[in-house]
């Protein structure tokens, strides 16, 4: 012991202290109290012999165990998060896999069908994160519609060598048959929510113009101009609110069982939600959600593909 103390007090003192510093620096990067650790080293640059050095390393060990406990706790939280939320884009908060009142201004409980990003493709400009949710009580409508005898015979189950789910995936990936299948699903009265979360700061006017443009881009929008004109005016009236929409806030568009659209806004910073207005012309909601979920150029291909995968598993 005397020989060890002598070596520690002389030749090995500096390297041992350096080791202590290095270890503490590493520990400080693991969510530990970096300032407190630095202070500890600064106050006791030259530990008093073996006892001083021993005390230093006992302190290191105590902090390390504390840090390890903290990290284990955080790891447990991380493991639980994927069941409750999904990461859509690093610029915005993860999307919850369920939407419930009163946190969100919606009429019932919704579960996620899929998610993705809405982008301006020619410049790869990300506009907003998009999540599509279905009412939990309405999930039974999905197999009822997409596994019906009529649709299965006329549009889905053409390849007898494949399962119904495989044929359904092919049909929903087809621009033409996907329109038919999704329109039938929308006509069933299924309740849906589109959660729109801007990736960059924007304003209500830009969001409104984007929705109007998307609806006008649907080929069926030309079939009934009177209903379309009336419905778009109702949508514009719902966006009478002015001002900015910071990134990471939510615009919620709820397609209700009667075909009405309810437009709401959730301010993440204040935690306040506001019902902005309602669109009673049912054509508007049908065209908008059809654009999200079907056709040759869905508004968000990644969202559409994600929803299709979920629909196939539920059908």
Swiss-Prot record:
Keywords: Mitochondrion, Transit peptide. One of its GO terms (cellular component) is mitochondrion. It is found in: Mitochondrion. The keyword tRNA processing does not apply. Residues 1-35 form a transit peptide. One of its GO terms (molecular function) is intramolecular lyase activity. InterPro entries: Chalcone_isomerase, Chalcone_isomerase_3-sand, Chalcone_isomerase_sf. Belongs to the AIM18/AIM46 family. This is Altered inheritance of mitochondria protein 18, mitochondrial. It comes from Kluyveromyces lactis (strain ATCC 8585 / CBS 2359 / DSM 70799 / NBRC 1267 / NRRL Y-1140 / WM37).
């Amino acid at each position: 012991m005397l020989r060890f103390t002598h070596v520690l007090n002389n030749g090995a003192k500096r390297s041992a202290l350096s080791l202590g510093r290095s270890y503490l620096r590493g520990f400080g990067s693991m969510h530990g109290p970096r300032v407190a650790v630095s202070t500890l080293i600064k106050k006791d640059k030259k530990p008093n012999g073996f006892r001083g050095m021993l005390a230093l390393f006992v302190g290191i060990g105590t902090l390390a165990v504390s840090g390890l406990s903290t990290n284990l706790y955080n790891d447990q939280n991380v493991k639980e998060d994927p069941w409750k939320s999904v990461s859509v884009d690093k610029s915005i908060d993860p999307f919850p896999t369920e939407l419930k009142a009163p946190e969100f201004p919606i009429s019932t409980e919704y579960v996620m069908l899929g998610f993705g990003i809405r982008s301006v493709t020619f410049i790869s400009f990300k506009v907003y994160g998009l999540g599509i949710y279905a009412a939990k009580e309405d999930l039974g409508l999905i197999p009822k519609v997409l596994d019906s005898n009529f649709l299965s015979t006329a549009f889905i189950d053409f390849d007898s060598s494949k399962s119904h789910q495989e044929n359904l995936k092919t049909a929903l990936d087809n621009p033409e048959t996907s329109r038919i299948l999704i329109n039938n699903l929308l006509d069933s009265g299924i309740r849906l929510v589109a959660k729109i979360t801007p990736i960059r700061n924007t304003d209500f006017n830009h969001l409104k113009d984007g929705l109007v443009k998307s609806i006008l881009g649907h080929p069926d929008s030309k079939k009934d101009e009177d209903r379309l004109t009336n419905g778009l005016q109702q949508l514009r009236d719902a966006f009478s609110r002015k001002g900015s929409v910071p990134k990471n806030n939510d615009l919620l568009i709820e397609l209700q069982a009667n075909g009405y659209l309810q437009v709401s806004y959730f301010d993440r910073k204040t935690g306040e939600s506001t019902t902005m207005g309602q669109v009673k012309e049912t054509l508007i909601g049908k065209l908008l959600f059809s654009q999200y979920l079907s056709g040759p150029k869905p508004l968000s291909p990644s969202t559409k593909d994600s929803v299709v995968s979920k629909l196939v598993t539920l059908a």
